[in-house]
From Swiss-Prot:
Annotated signal peptide: none
Enzyme class, spelled out: transferase
Classification lineage: Bacteria, Pseudomonadati, Pseudomonadota, Gammaproteobacteria, Enterobacterales
Keywords recorded for this protein, A-Z: 4Fe-4S, ATP-binding, Cytoplasm, Iron, Iron-sulfur, Magnesium, Metal-binding, Nucleotide-binding, RNA-binding, Transferase, tRNA processing, tRNA-binding
Primary localization: cytoplasm
Name of this chain's protein: tRNA-cytidine(32) 2-sulfurtransferase
Species: Salmonella paratyphi B (strain ATCC BAA-1250 / SPB7)
Amino acid sequence: MQEIQKNTKKEQYNLNKLQKRLRRNVGEAIADFNMIEEGDRIMVCLSGGKDSYTMLEILRNLQQSAPINFSLVAVNLDQKQPGFPEHILPAYLEQLGVEYKIVEENTYGIVKEKIPEGKTTCSLCSRLRRGILYRTATELGATKIALGHHRDDILQTLFLNMFYGGKMKGMPPKLMSDDGKHIVIRPLAYCREKDIIRFAEAKAFPIIPCNLCGSQPNLQRQVIADMLRDWDKRYPGRIETMFSAMQNVVPSHLCDTNLFDFKGITHGSEVVDGGDLAFDREEIPLQPAGWQPEEDDTSVEALRLDVIEVK
């Protein structure tokens, strides 16, 4: 009995510590990008996955002690995939006492009609979903739309664009929506996926599977995800360093003429960003930039979230 109590206390301690880290990460992102302002009504897009559950939980937690007032409304889009457990999210949100809205739109039928069998449906599905969410935000009077993308998603997108798109473009933590009417925010921008996995497992969120549509997986993104996961295991701190690089861009040392006026450099021009250091031996710090090892940075390969079996 004492051993059980000891384990329970340790688990609670670890959960509290993890929640504080996620709360700190989200708080810093909100402050750095001015994501949430006084009086905001935040529409939290809830898919039923680990990321959106974590985002809602941390925002609710911050709401209690934030120096500003803001409200939350959770929104789920029921796209009418066969077998979608439509009772799960309403029951969960009612138990929490969170305001919510379930939007029912048969985008599944549209996608199946337009996309050949076996082809990736994500692009069309995403466009349809985006338009519905923008419309819903207007109907609810939401001032911000919160999405659950985390740090790993942002890095994956950067490498996807570099490897396959020929662009150095990531996923912005805050942006104006396509229709020019809504501000979209990503409060989990500084959060590590492995922390979210641990948190979701500890909180036992009722995870809904994301493979109900039967679409082919995004193989390119999976390749990038596997690469980053391998780097994280073999070279601790590399992921943090790469993310720091996204926040420390030097346009004069890249090749984009839209970002820097290379033609304007003439005799007598001032030295910019250290000038030409190409022939100097670069001093590389012994510890990766932006990395602080955590006590509980153990492998999460064995962690698996319990997914509700859909019958």
